Design a protein with these regions (language model features):
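Conserved catalytic cysteine-centered active-site region
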Residues: 113-115, 244-252, 276-287, 291-294
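General beta-strand structural signal in soluble alpha/beta enzymes
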Residues: 34, 78-82, 118, 193-195, ...
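Gly/Pro-rich active-site capping loops and adjacent beta-alpha segments
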Residues: 6-16, 133-155, 175, 232, ...
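Flexible hinge/switch segments at interdomain interfaces of large molecular machines
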Residues: 39-48, 207-210, 352-365
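Flexible, low-hydrophobicity surface segments
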Residues: 1-171, 192-195, 277
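Alpha-helical support elements that line or immediately flank enzyme active sites
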Residues: 52-86, 123-144, 211-278, 332-346, ...
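Short Pro/Gly-enriched beta-strand edge/turn motifs at strand-loop
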Residues: 96-98, 187-202, 284-291, 333
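Helix-loop-helix junctions that connect adjacent transmembrane helices in secondary transporters/permeases
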Residues: 159-241, 384, 392
Length: 421
């Protein structure tokens, strides 16, 4: 089939203020000269250095935690465990979780008091006069675990008898889409194509690790300057610190890379707790190793696409199953899963659709927002499936790939989620 491109008619644009003109970024000068202040650049007088003690096993019960040697080390201002916290659950009340209600078993803990669920779970906080002293104090913390079986594969985590990461069944979120009649749609197809795809964990590796400072001002307000993408977390942080919201002020600094990884609470709560306990300014900056161990990743997905297609390359039906690996805690998994579900069929008209998606807790690092927020998982698969269908149809009908591509083009239509494309 021959296709000749037609020239587009000339378009006269109105005079625009920005489009088509050079724009000077307001932050360009500071970044080019190195004068921009990031969270890790802030040092305060009389400041303590904070460190976090993390779990070294993926799943187990804390049998004994002894921080007495760390507390006795000269230069250590305080050591905090879950026993000293007013409440240890960092509530993440996310809509979209199973039953549309928060499942407490999937909430993250500020500090693990009895159970650890992944390598990197925070157990204790240390504040000391110097960074070296704080690191030495971490080495003096003694912990004994009763190790439990761990589960890393979300499909295994769904099986009866699997290790329980999130009670009662490891499911932290479900979504579904129903449109038309799937059986009738498949019966209309000349060919049914089924494929299973996997999307792996992805690490952001942003240049700036998690960092911030906290202090108490003359009004008795806890101030936190932090590299964050969401300052609105102050409500949850105030709850964790057991102080009124008007006693907490969070100021975001320039973010040296976030990509969704700094949408969650990172070290804000740790800073607030250490500052309240010591009544002194505290600074925390993760090392690269700590950052990679402690922050979230992009969700791994297992996606099975089963689609029916006619010889004219019209999709008659689509059955899609998605399993997302939530890791140890829920965080933004319900929202990420929602967007992946809503875009599961891509930009194609499909009149008969069944989509089932589930996010599953495992003993992996927790997963959360990453650029695209679930949509890339669905999009990359949606663009792989047409290629699979074309290959199958070309083999059966002796069409070229180009011909089958043109046959699949359509004008404006309504997507299964009632959006107009």
């Amino acid at each position: 089939m021959k296709y000749t491109a037609k020239p587009l008619p000339p378009v006269t644009l109105p005079e625009l203020r920005q489009v088509g003109k050079p724009l000077r970024r307001v932050d360009a000068l500071g970044k080019c000269t190195g004068s921009t202040v990031y969270a890790g650049d802030i040092f305060l007088p009389n400041m303590l250095h904070g460190k976090v003690f993390h779990s070294s096993i993926p799943h187990g019960r804390i049998v004994r935690l002894d921080v007495s040697k760390a507390r006795a080390l000269p230069g250590v201002a305080c050591v905090i465990t879950a026993a000293e916290l007013p409440q240890s659950v960092l509530v993440t009340d996310m809509p979209g979780q199973t039953g549309q209600k928060r499942r407490a078993g999937s909430d993250a803990h500020i500090l693990a008091g009895t159970m650890v669920r992944f390598i990197g779970d925070p157990i204790s906080l240390v504040a000391a006069e110097t960074q070296a002293t704080a690191e030495q104090a971490l080495q003096l913390i003694e912990v004994e675990y009763e190790a439990f079986p761990a589960v890393y594969d979300p499909l295994e985590a769904l099986q009866p008898g699997a290790p329980v990461v999130s009670t009662p069944d490891n499911v932290v979120a479900r979504w579904k889409i129903r449109k038309g009649n799937l059986q009738e749609g498949m019966a209309q197809a000349d060919l049914v194509v089924e494929n299973t795809f996997t999307v792996p964990f992805v690490e952001r590796a942003y240049i700036e690790p998690e960092a911030g400072v906290a202090w108490i001002d003359e009004r008795n307000v806890v101030n936190i300057r932090i590299c964050t993408q969401v300052v609105e977390h102050f409500r949850s942080i105030a709850l964790a610190l057991n102080i009124p919201q008007n006693r907490l002020h969070i100021q975001g600094t320039m973010v040296g890379g976030g990509f969704g990884g700094k949408e969650d609470i990172t070290v804000e709560t740790f800073l607030g707790l250490l500052t309240l306990h010591t009544q002194r300014p505290v600074r925390i900056e993760y090392s690269r190793e700590e950052s990679i161990q402690a922050h979230s990743k992009r969700h791994p997905f297992i996606i099975t696409h089963r689609t029916g297609v006619t010889r004219e390359v019209r999709i008659t039906a689509a059955e899609i199953k998605m399993v997302a690996n939530s890791g140890a805690y829920v965080y933004l998994s319900p929202y990420v899963l929602l967007y992946a579900t809503a875009t599961a069929t891509g930009p194609y008209r499909v009149d008969n659709v069944r989509v089932d998606s589930v996010a599953v807790a495992t003993n992996n690092p927790f997963t959360s927002a990453f650029r695209g927020f679930g949509t890339p998982h669905a999009s990359c698969i949606c663009q792989a499936m047409p290629s699979c269908r074309r290959q199958a149809l070309c083999a059966r009908c002796c069409w070229s790939g180009l011909q089958s591509s043109w046959r699949s083009l359509r004008k404006t239509w309504i997507l299964p989620t009632a959006r107009c494309l």
